């Protein structure tokens, strides 16, 4: 028989050649093979489609983060919390939506830069359920996450403002004695004074929830001047107060929580009789006349004047300062979001 050469390879087929590498088998197409080109084209199309889907998913996520809505939060019994005074808890869909709108308005005017913690705090207020669980720290209005906290702060954390207030101690005490001249227990409360929840507890505000009480400031010019010299005094949002605080003997202020962990409350002792005590986060402390005590009042705290009537009242000057770890852009945004009357 005559020799027959092998048939020539066809160009319209796929030559499948297995190349074993470990446990994998690769299928290669011969150049010019139509099926191989089709498979390569299909693989490229799948890759492009996958990348496009991932890009769309990322864009959707960014949109949701920027415009996300907070799920409604309710009272433990299912009743939405009351909207109104910022001292009350900010749980509740309506209030959280208002905070979101305020944050977005601020970011449009200025920038989203540095707003990550604020965004997270507003978004997760309902998740924290601060008003529904027992805790040693439970701010009643706004909680800023990832903020270092302790019941008491060292003097060095607010050295400049502490020194200003302590140097002003004689003038502040003198002005207190002037406004308290007509103050007598049991008598009608003099002008400018406020009776708090406990009848033995009175306050004289120079700033109340971020608003200056002009008449009271005019009555205490040196104290007002000292406040104006402070670098971290909160004077533009509803978390900021400055006042003379008076407790009569036998008065006990039961455990309460402050509205936010973004502030540090500075207590300057003016008159501290025996038997006066402050307990914050389970840690007791005593005031000293002429010296400042820095407190995070978002922790559970109680105040008591256990002295006798002959000891006279306890008098503390209080000024709310920014927490040292709240950054400048965050402070500006909080002033905008929690502006008085907003």
Label every model-predicted segment.
Residues 247, 271, 281, 296-298, ...:
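Structured beta-strand/turn binding interfaces of compact recognition modules in eukaryotic regulators
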Residues 253-256, 277-279, 295, 301-309:
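Short beta-strand His + acidic residue motifs that chelate non-heme Fe in jelly-roll/DSBH
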Residues 1-16:
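Intrinsically disordered, low-complexity basic segments at termini and long loops, enriched
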Residues 12-13, 17-263, 273-276, 326-342:
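Fe(II)/2-oxoglutarate oxygenase catalytic core
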Residues 246, 270, 305-307:
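Short, low-complexity Ser/Thr-rich regulatory SLiMs
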Residues 286-300:
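Conserved metal-binding segment of the jelly-roll/cupin
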């Amino acid at each position: 028989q005559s020799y027959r050469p092998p048939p020539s390879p066809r160009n319209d087929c796929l030559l499948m050649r297995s190349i074993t590498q470990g446990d994998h088998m690769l299928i290669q197409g011969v150049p010019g093979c139509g099926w191989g080109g089709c498979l390569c084209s299909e693989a490229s199309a799948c890759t492009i489609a996958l990348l496009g889907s991932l890009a769309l998913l990322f864009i959707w996520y960014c949109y949701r983060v920027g415009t996300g809505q907070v799920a409604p939060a309710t009272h433990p019994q299912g009743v939405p919390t009351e909207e109104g005074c910022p001292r009350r808890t900010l749980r509740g869909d309506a209030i959280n939506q208002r905070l979101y709108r305020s944050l977005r308005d601020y970011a449009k005017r200025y920038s989203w830069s540095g707003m990550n913690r604020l965004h997270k705090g507003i978004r997760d207020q309902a998740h924290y359920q601060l008003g529904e669980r027992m805790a040693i720290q439970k701010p009643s209005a706004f909680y800023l996450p990832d903020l270092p906290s302790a019941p008491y702060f060292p003097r060095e954390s607010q050295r400049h403002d502490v020194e200003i207030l302590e140097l002003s101690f004689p003038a502040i005490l003198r002005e207190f004695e002037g406004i308290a001249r007509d103050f007598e227990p049991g008598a009608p409360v003099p002008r400018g004074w406020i009776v708090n929840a406990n009848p033995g507890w009175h306050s004289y505000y120079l700033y109340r929830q971020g608003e200056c009480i002009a008449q009271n400031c005019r009555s205490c010019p040196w104290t007002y001047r000292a406040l104006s010299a402070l670098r971290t005094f909160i004077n533009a949002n509803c978390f900021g107060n400055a006042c003379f605080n008076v407790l009569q003997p036998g008065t006990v202020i039961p455990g309460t929580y402050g509205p936010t962990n973004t502030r540090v409350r500075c207590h300057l002792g003016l008159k501290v009789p025996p038997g006066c005590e402050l307990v914050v986060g389970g840690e007791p402390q005593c005031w000293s006349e002429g010296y400042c005590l820095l407190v995070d009042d978002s922790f559970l705290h109680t105040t008591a004047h256990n002295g006798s009537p002959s000891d006279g009242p306890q008098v503390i000057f209080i000024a709310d300062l920014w927490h040292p770890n709240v950054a400048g852009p965050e402070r500006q945004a909080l002033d905008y979001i929690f502006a008085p009357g907003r």
